[in-house]
């Protein structure tokens, strides 16, 4: 709960003899921090020391259709590697993507786990698995997070705590953390396909931009931590 939530609830309850509503915050920030602490320390590589890997996370068809052509063109002029995870991985989508990338001379491999992902040299790695994004964010340099061109952008807290600059579509404003990520320049929202590759250049070609966005992303999560403790303290008081 933030100050705006507090005001709304207070106005609703002002006739019910309730005069004090403490602000505890959002326990989800604590949860994502706790999950990140379980990550092996050796896997927590500084953003500028990571390989040039772009993670396309929770990709909806609307995201794919919006940016795929520009991504292929961009990859032909760079050396970055792409990890691609569909929102709902399935063999039909994997085959479509694999054929398309291969036709454009971009070597592609489909894997069912991330156990050996660091040993794969293919330009495109299509990951046919779920529940692996939290780990992958710690080894990627930039992430595109899907959903922003359809139902709403997916979880941004996991890439943020890993210090990964994010790019996502325009439907994000109902998520307060997403609004803060944009306002603090920890990530960028796009509405046109050309903006996608422009921001890839912005991050991959500038250590300063990458570092600033990475630090901003982590600070957003850390600055909102402590909600769980506040709730427990209030319940025990």
Which residue stretches match the model-derived regions?
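Nucleotide-activated sugar donor-binding and catalytic core shared by glycosyltransferases
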Residues: 1-237
